[in-house]
Amino acid sequence: MPVIEINDQEQFTYLTTTAAGDKLIVLYFHTSWAEPCKALKQVFEAISNEPSNSNVSFLSIDADENSEISELFEISAVPYFIIIHKGTILKELSGADPKEYVSLLEDCKNSVNSGSSQTHTMENANVNEGSHNDEDDDDEEEEEETEEQINARLTKLVNAAPVMLFMKGSPSEPKCGFSRQLVGILREHQVRFGFFDILRDESVRQNLKKFSEWPTFPQLYINGEFQGGLDIIKESLEEDPDFLQHALQS
C-alpha cells in the first residue's frame, strides 16, 4: 500500500486502531535533517508499493513535527522502524540498513501468518535503540559491543545531523536544567539541531564521556566535532556571538 504521511496524532490514532483491522503496520520515524533518512525514504516507498505488501500499512512520521507520537514511543534517534499488529509491537529497528529493514518486515509477515509471534503491548513498550524482545536480550548479553563497534556507533551518532545535542530528555521535555538551558540557547540563535536522549541508552551515555573526553551532559557536536558542554558554549558565545554559525561554516 502507498505510504501515508502522518500529520497529527488524531490521524495516527485512527490509522493504528479503528482503520487498522488485521493489517500489519510499519511506522517509519524520520527527520528532514538526518541524512540516512533521505535514502531510506526511497526504500520505504518502493517496498510499500510491492504487491506482496498489499495488506501492510506504511506510515511515515516526521519525529520533529509529531513530537507527541515520538515521545509516546520514546524515539531517541532516527531513522527508526516499529512494526505493529493489532495494537501490539512486534519488532523495532534503529539504523539505516535497508537489508535489515526488509528482513525484519518479512519476519513479521511470516510471524503474523503463523500466529506464533512473541510480542510486547504498546502500552508497555519501551521503544528505544537497543530494546528488543527477551530472546534478543539474551543474544545481546552474550555479544557485548567491542570498543571498536562502540566508537563506530558513536561516530555515526555525532554526525547524524550538522548540529547534534546529546542531552537528558528531549527538547520538548528536558530532564535536567543544563539540557533545558542549552536547548534554549540553540533555539534563541535559531540553530536547527538533532538530539539524542542519553537516558535511553546507557552504553551511549557512558561511552560518549570517553569518546568526547568530557564527563558531563549535555554535550554539543557541530559537524561531527565536539564543541563542549553548557558552560563552554556560553563562554564561546560571550567571546563570539556568532560562534554557532561560524562553527557550522568551518
UniProtKB/Swiss-Prot annotation:
Alphabetical list of InterPro entries matching this protein: Glutaredoxin, GRX_PICOT-like, Monothiol_GRX-rel, Thioredoxin-like_sf, Thioredoxin_domain
According to the entry, every stretch annotated as the Thioredoxin domain falls at: 1-110
Checking Gene3D superfamilies in the record gives: Glutaredoxin (3.40.30.10)
Give the compositionally biased regions (Acidic residues). 134-148
Write out the biased-composition intervals (Polar residues): 113-130
GO molecular function list = 2 iron, 2 sulfur cluster binding; disulfide oxidoreductase activity; iron-sulfur cluster binding; metal ion binding; RNA polymerase II-specific DNA-binding transcription factor binding
Binding of [2Fe-2S] cluster occurs at C176
- Asked if the Swiss-Prot or TrEMBL record annotates the protein with the keyword DNA-binding, the reply is no
Q: Which PANTHER family would you find in this protein's record?
A: GLUTAREDOXIN FAMILY MEMBER, GLUTAREDOXIN-3
Q: What does this protein do?
A: Monothiol glutaredoxin involved in the biogenesis of iron-sulfur clusters. Binds one iron-sulfur cluster per dimer. The iron-sulfur cluster is bound between subunits, and is complexed by a bound glutathione and a cysteine residue from each subunit.
State the similarity comment. Belongs to the glutaredoxin family. Monothiol subfamily.
Assembly information from the UniProt record: Homodimer. Heterodimer with FRA2.
State the protein's name.
Answer: Monothiol glutaredoxin-3
Species: Saccharomyces cerevisiae (strain ATCC 204508 / S288c) (Baker's yeast)
Q: What gene is behind this protein?
A: GRX3
